[in-house]
Curated annotation (Swiss-Prot):
It comes from Paracidovorax citrulli (strain AAC00-1) (Acidovorax citrulli). Keywords: Ribonucleoprotein, Ribosomal protein, RNA-binding, rRNA-binding. Residues 50-60 have a biased composition (Basic residues). Part of the 50S ribosomal subunit. Forms a bridge to the 30S subunit in the 70S ribosome. Belongs to the universal ribosomal protein uL2 family. Residues 37-60, 224-252 are annotated as: Disordered. This is Large ribosomal subunit protein uL2.
């Protein structure tokens, strides 16, 4: 892949940096794996905003991606690599030997025509999915399960991966990109390699309208509001917050830890690095 800097033919094009998609399939998505996606625009059944800064955006179908990879010992051939508007990673359409087709998250360096397989006896090769107990220590992995059979939940976005550090009894230690080290059961599955489209982080949208196409609405600063709307609001002319930064409901927003999941706290060996 390559990065393209657009010519400054207009203010909206001046700062645009795109990632090429020349290697991606240019036809329609596989219809049997498409589902309608109804946009809620951040509203509940009463029409009240429950999630701010959402609404509008381009309509698109949801691609049903196989995160479980549970067709063991059946080889699958990669038919094409596709763009997915629902995620930063690319997806690959694979055809199993029994004729079934599924979408998977496309790993880096996975070529069209390659053969992948899942299961405990699968070879250590990019795109193959195995239980963590069968993966060599030090391997780069992605699409990692947190519970056996629940489907991949970790390292699914573009360019991400994790490293298998050690195995102790029925648990393994996995280091995330953030630096967090987490204990994961060795029966959980993971895929060899890292997620493709690693240059996604170099992309620059160039204008606010692109965010609107993505269904993201503007974020208004609290200091620009009236005091009835935000704790930072009010004042004559330009004024500062006058207090520690808080959200519209008065909760601290900077440097305040929000994690509150005691049930899985014991699975974290070391917290992420800032």
């Amino acid at each position: 892949m390559a990065v393209i800097k657009m010519k400054p033919t207009s203010p909206g094009q001046r700062a645009v940096v795109k990632v090429t998609r020349d290697h991606l399939y240019k036809g329609e998505a596989f219809a049997a794996l498409l589902e309608p996606q109804h946009q809620k625009s951040g509203r509940n059944n009463n029409g009240h905003i429950t999630t701010r800064h959402k609404g509008g955006g381009h309509k698109h179908h949801y691609r049903v991606v196989d995160f479980k990879r549970n067709k063991d010992a059946i080889p699958a051939k990669v038919e094409r690599i596709e763009y997915d508007p629902n995620r930063t990673a690319h997806i690959a359409l694979v055809c199993y030997a029994d004729g079934e087709r599924r979408y998977i998250i496309a790993p880096r360096n996975l070529e069209v025509g390659a053969t992948i397989v899942s299961g405990s006896e699968a070879p250590i090769r990019v795109g193959n999915t195995l239980p963590i107990r069968n993966i060599p220590v030090g391997s780069t992995i992605h699409c990692i399960e947190l519970k056996p059979g629940a489907g991949a939940q970790i390292a699914r976005s573009a360019g991400t991966s994790a490293t298998l550090l050690a195995r102790e009894g029925t648990y393994a230690q996995v280091r995330m990109r953030s630096g967090e080290v987490r204990r994961i059961h060795i029966e959980c599955r993971a895929t060899i390699g890292e997620v493709a489209n690693e240059e996604h982080s170099l992309r620059q949208l160039g204008k606010a309208g692109v965010k609107r196409w993505m269904g993201i609405r503007p974020t208004v600063r609290g200091v620009a509001m009236n005091p009835i709307d935000h704790p930072h609001g009010g004042g004559e002319g330009r004024t500062g917050e006058g207090r520690h930064a808080v959200d519209p409901w008065g909760n601290l927003t900077k440097g305040y830890r929000t994690r509150n999941n005691k049930r899985t706290q014991v699975m974290i060996v070391s917290r992420r690095k800032k």
